[in-house]
A protein has these predicted regions:
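Active-site neighborhoods and metal-handling regions in enzymes and metal-associated proteins
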Residues: 1-220
Length: 220
């Protein structure tokens, strides 16, 4: 038997370990955070305030982005999309944060259906104004860790789409048995790689500022 914290490995890694262990009649246990039980001075999760990325920088509203992702879900035949890659989440919702140093992301998860956006986040980090904007786009806020229980309640007749390289194994294992899981790249990851005119113009401005700073450094 092999044990690990399923939140710390990807679906792809977990499935690979399962395959190897099955050949040896072994099992993989992934539901316990053993280190957490003895880590008495473990730092608290970051709760930096979430802020909105204005559409003048994003070039596209969150409503339009959500609609585009839902179109990809339809093409794949999925009714549910589980999203856990932080850069894709902040792109989709037009938000930013400071939960990870040097990365403007928010510790969060998203479950996207055809009519709702379930946003799992430390709610005290979401200012009222940001909450209101997200709710206008159909988002429902939930406590960060609640996703692990909510995934268990998914209708097994639904098809669930997720990226196996970015989704953690514990989340995947909580999906009801018998549910069809569609493994494919997150549509948000593909979309955000294709910059719109507003983003391209802002990239030029950013490069000018970066070049100015580098020139000053070289001169110094």
């Amino acid at each position: 038997c092999m044990g690990c914290d399923g939140r710390s490995i990807s679906v792809a890694e977990g499935r690979k370990y399962e395959e190897l262990l099955n050949k040896k009649e072994g099992t993989l246990k992934c539901q316990d955070d053993l280190a957490g039980k003895i880590w008495s001075d473990r730092p608290q999760m970051s709760k930096e305030p979430v802020y909105v990325l204005n559409v003048k920088y994003a070039g596209e509203t969150r409503e339009d982005k959500i609609s585009r992702v839902r179109e990809e879900m339809k093409k794949a035949g999925a009714q549910v999309h589980v999203l856990s890659s932080l850069d894709d989440i902040v792109w989709l919702l037009n938000i930013r944060g400071n939960d990870i140093e040097y990365n403007p992301v928010v510790l969060s998860y998203v479950i996207l259906t055809m009519d709702q956006v379930h946003f799992y986040v430390q709610e005290e980090a979401v200012p009222d104004q940001v909450r209101e904007e997200l709710e206008k786009a159909g988002a429902v806020l939930h406590p960060y860790f609640q996703i692990y229980e909510d995934v268990k309640k998914l209708d097994p007749s639904y098809k669930v789409m997720l990226e196996e390289q970015c989704t953690n194994y514990a989340l995947y294992k909580n999906i009801p048995e018998g549910t069809e899981v569609i493994f494919q790249p997150n549509p948000a990851a593909v979309f955000k790689g294709n910059k719109n005119p507003v983003e391209m113009e802002n990239l030029k401005i950013a490069h000018v500022k970066d070049s100015r700073a580098m020139s000053r450094f070289i001169y110094w």
